[in-house]
């Protein structure tokens, strides 16, 4: 999936899929991430691992997409968050809702 601001590479698996996000996830591009998550769910995925290592910007619209997927029953795990993504997750108070794989500190 490609947008001028964000690109999401998807590796489908069973029961989880990995989404590698590149670029900026904001109010204008969060729909790309939302569509990738929906496609994974529609494909039978029960968990998504979202790699945010190459995210140069993420705002609350991007976190909202991840949070709503988790609230809706999909397992959501954040992997390799960029420094900015890690900070935004911490500042938004979403460390419990969006666990970071292999990480004990956010902020």
Regions picked out by a protein language model, each given a short descriptive name:
Residues 1-107:
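STAS-like cytosolic regulatory interaction modules
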């Amino acid at each position: 999936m490609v947008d001028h601001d964000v690109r999401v590479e998807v590796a489908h698996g069973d029961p989880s899929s990995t989404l590698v996000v590149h670029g900026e996830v904001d109010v204008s591009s969060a729909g790309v991430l939302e569509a990738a998550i929906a496609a994974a769910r529609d494909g039978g995925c029960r968990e998504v691992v979202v790699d945010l290592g190459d995210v140069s910007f993420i705002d609350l619209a991007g976190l909202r997409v991840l949070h709503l997927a988790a609230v809706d029953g999909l397992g959501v795990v954040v992997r390799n968050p960029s420094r900015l993504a890690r900070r935004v997750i911490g500042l938004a108070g979403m460390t419990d809702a969006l666990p970071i794989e292999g990480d004990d500190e956010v902020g």
